Design a protein with these regions (language model features):
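Structured soluble/peripheral alpha/beta segments that form catalytic or ligand/cofactor-binding pockets
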Residues: 1-203
């Protein structure tokens, strides 16, 4: 969660015994995620890194419709990506920190039989809202064997996602602290208004 003067980031390692799953629920430690067929509800009870501030509250993502297609990221078939809800509505209600917000959102998932870093040297993703029910997504990944995955999709959960010609490469400036490259694609070009995350592995 990003606020004007601070951010709240949690990525807590848990033991296998802390995991519970069912067809509609995922629980890891004190936090859980459940789906009722139309809404994904996330109940959070975590601590941020590195200062251990509380992150506690609820996030509800309305998903009245979803896409039904997964995309292969490599010809070997070991990796797939599914833009489940290219457009969605999100409601954030946190007690700690005190945050209330509603707006546009997105849900996707990556899956595979081997780790992403075993196959790919890097991967890049961007998404732009194109109205209340549509968006445009660019997904690009470069494999260690020289293969490249590049796809540009337009649409939404009700109409599905249609392939488009990919925009030309127009890289963002490198990250301000760790200097990680930020490849991107756009017809118009762009400026960096704010860098939300700048780490050695994700910028």
């Amino acid at each position: 969660f990003y606020e004007p003067r601070q951010k709240h980031w949690a990525m807590t390692e848990r033991r296998a015994r802390d995991l519970q799953t069912s067809s509609s629920m995922l629980k890891i430690g004190p936090s859980s995620m459940s789906f009722d067929g139309e809404s994904l509800t996330v109940d959070l009870d975590e601590r941020s890194a590195p200062f251990r501030r509380a992150i506690r509250g609820k996030v509800v993502i309305d998903i009245p419709a979803h896409t039904d297609r997964c995309y292969a990221l490599h010809s070997a078939g070991e990796h797939r990506w599914w833009p489940i809800a290219p457009t969605a509505r999100v409601k954030v209600s946190l007690d700690a920190p005190s945050v209330r917000w509603e707006g546009a959102g997105y849900v996707d998932t990556n899956g595979g039989t081997v780790a992403l870093e075993d196959t790919f040297t890097d991967w890049h993703w961007s998404r732009a809202d194109m109205g209340p029910e549509n968006c445009r997504i660019v997904y690009e990944a470069h494999a260690r064997d020289g293969e490249t995955c590049l796809m540009t999709l337009f649409g939404g959960p009700k109409t599905g996602m249609a392939s488009e010609h990919s925009p030309p490469r127009r890289d963002l400036s490198v990250g301000p602290i760790w200097r990680v490259s930020r490849p991107a694609r756009s017809y118009q070009g762009f400026n960096v208004e704010k860098t939300l995350e700048d780490t050695p592995f994700y910028t």
